[in-house]
Curated annotation (Swiss-Prot):
InterPro entries with a match to the protein in the record: HABP4_PAIRBP1-bd (IPR006861), Papain-like_cys_pep_sf (IPR038765), Peptidase_C19 (IPR050164), Peptidase_C19_UCH (IPR001394), USP_CS (IPR018200), USP_dom (IPR028889)
EC numbers for this chain: 3.4.19.12
Keyword DNA-binding belongs to the record: no
Any one annotated GO CC term: endoplasmic reticulum
Gene: USP17L20
Composition bias type Basic and acidic residues, residue spans: 382-392, 398-413
Descriptive protein name: Ubiquitin carboxyl-terminal hydrolase 17-like protein 20
Domain of life where this protein originates: Eukaryota
Single Gene Ontology MF annotation: cysteine-type deubiquitinase activity
Location of the USP domain: 80-375
Species of the source: Homo sapiens (Human)
PANTHER family: INACTIVE UBIQUITIN CARBOXYL-TERMINAL HYDROLASE 17-LIKE PROTEIN 4-RELATED, UBIQUITIN CARBOXYL-TERMINAL HYDROLASE
């Protein structure tokens, strides 16, 4: 439902031409640095992020890639179900998908962040670490998600699962920044969260008159796919990267020949993420009605055809989680998910219900959000488990209470979340609220010069334009009405019928606004006058 995502990365734009002019940028281009386009090399899992380091200098590496856990710390079996606290199926479905994201789960189970975090209270990384640890090390049980996970977002009604997912990812990314308040915007794209979920778009315009080429690079955390004319994910991706001809009224104003001329424009993935979040745009921007069509998606997806360098060998991703919406409209329905445990077995995670499933069932769903991981990453994590490198449960009691074929034991009370400090919830609400998150997105729409369906403005040749983020760290004052509508923790386990929630999702105004972007997630303020 939303194709925008908040994040704090930078954007770079290059112009390189067969005929270079010696025009000097005027005073308005205060952030422009002259540079030459870096020589490209074949992309690999190890070099894709490095290419972005060449695009602009990075003053500080916030999370060196070598710090990412390489071996799996996850238990092989499936973990706990999540109690529905009242219209929170969207929270549960999203949390389960994040919990079974191998690089994220391994980092959380390593406890590396909490050992060095100076915030603790109000830190989304610490909160997610506690949740993932409890969920994975309490198989056969039902646990209550912490209030702090949805503080500032949940308002007593059902919301958009994708919005909550990216709200949480953004909060985790911001949690990587305390202590690095003055870092440049390019360094902020080196956070652990960006290394897991992030990559870079490349928007290229080629003037057909003088053959000048303009490249714009912009970060992403997820990819939204238009499915109205697509029967499969591959078709939607092909449509996304299909070259567009700019002519007539849409002719390109070239910065070299200084005239409006025909041009071709192409959007491709310049660097790939370790984990791909693909969002299928299933809801009408006007009516909110659901596009209830079957869109095929594969268990293994080769992303190489959609990269800037398509001839460097396969880039295979494997499916490990699927988020599903059941219903006919964005105004009601129910969310649940399918996840692939480390052992390779698929499970349906429907609030408290955890049942074994099959890949056939998984691939037959009307998916809303698809989660893919690079095949090499998945195999490395799976291999470490098969070799017995799985550590003892961190802080969890020894138990052999395992779910048989995914069936949960109902003869025990739900595991309660630790009593929360009121200051924790208050601070979390102050720092990140749903209204403020949507406000930021409204203020940071996709720039015309990057939108694949719009014509870019004129830029001087042979320049590097550094676009700083418009997102501010400061948040709104605490809203008592939102505080009062936080999760109502109950000790009772809901029935399946009770968990079939109906509620109003995000406003249609937000949906219409979000559709204007072309599958991009960082909304940059252009610090130069065009």
């Amino acid at each position: 439902m939303e194709d925008d995502s908040l994040y704090l990365g930078g954007e770079w734009q290059f112009n390189h031409f067969s005929k270079l002019t010696s025009s000097r940028p005027d005073a308005a281009f205060a952030e422009i640095q002259r540079t030459s386009l870096p020589e490209k090399s074949p992309l690999s899992c190890e070099t894709r992020v490095d290419l972005c380091d060449d695009l602009a200098p990075v003053a500080r590496q916030l999370a060196p890639r070598e710090k990412l856990p390489l071996s799996s710390r996850r238990p092989a079996a499936v973990g706990a179900g999540l109690q529905n606290m009242g219209n929170t199926c969207y929270v549960n479905a999203s949390l389960q998908c994040l919990t079974y994201t191998p690089p994220l789960a391994n980092y959380m189970l390593s406890r590396e962040h909490s050992q060095t975090c100076h915030r603790h209270k109000g830190c989304m990384l610490c909160t997610m670490q506690a949740h993932i640890t409890r969920a994975l090390h309490n198989p056969g049980h039902v646990i209550q998600p912490s209030q702090a996970l949805a503080a500032g977002f949940h308002r007593g009604k059902q919301e958009d699962a994708h919005e909550f997912l990216m709200f949480t990812v953004d909060a985790m990314k911001k949690a990587c920044l305390p202590g690095h308040k003055q870092v440049d915007h390019h360094s902020k794209d080196t956070t652990l969260i960006h290394q897991i979920f992030g990559g870079y778009w490349r928007s290229q315009i080629k003037c057909l008159h003088c053959h000048g080429i303009s490249d714009t690079f912009d970060p992403y955390l997820d990819i939204a796919l238009d499915i109205q004319a697509a029967q499969s994910v591959q078709q939607a991706l092909e449509q996304l990267v299909k070259p567009e001809e700019l002519n007539g009224e849409n002719a390109y104003h070239c910065g070299v020949c200084l005239q409006r001329a025909p041009a071709s424009k192409t959007l491709t993935l310049h660097t790939s993420a370790k984990v791909l979040i693909l969002v299928l745009k299933r809801f009408s921007d006007v009516t909110g009605n659901k596009i209830a069509k079957n869109v095929q998606y594969p268990e293994c997806l080769d992303m190489q055809p959609y990269m800037s360098q398509p001839n460097t060998g396969p880039l295979v991703y494997v499916l490990y989680a699927v988020l599903v919406h059941a219903g006919w409209s964005c105004h009601n329905g129910h969310y649940f998910s399918y996840v692939k445990a480390q052992e390779g077995q698929w499970y349906k995670m429907d609030d408290a219900e955890v049942t074994a499933s099959s890949i056939t069932s998984v691939l037959s769903q009307q998916a809303y959000v698809l989660f893919y991981i690079q095949k090499s990453e998945w195999e490395r994590h799976s291999e470490s488990v098969s070799r017995g490198r799985e550590p003892r449960a961190l802080g969890a009691e020894d138990t052999d209470r395992r779910a048989t074929q995914g069936e949960l034991k109902r003869d025990h009370p739900c595991l309660q979340a630790p009593e929360l400090d009121e200051h924790l919830v208050e601070r979390a609400t102050q720092e990140s609220t749903l209204d403020h998150w949507k406000f930021l997105q409204e203020q940071n729409k996709t720039k015309p010069e990057f939108n694949v369906r719009k014509v870019e403005g004129t830029l001087p040749p042979d320049v590097l334009v550094i676009h700083q983020s418009k997102y501010k760290c400061g948040m709104k004052n605490h809203h008592p009405e939102q505080q009062s509508s936080l999760l109502n923790l109950s000790s009772t386990t809901p029935t399946h019928q009770e968990s079939m929630n109906t509620g109003t999702l995000a406003s249609l105004r937000g949906r219409a606004r979000r559709s204007k972007g072309k599958n991009k997630h960082s909304k940059r303020a252009l610090l130069v006058c065009q």
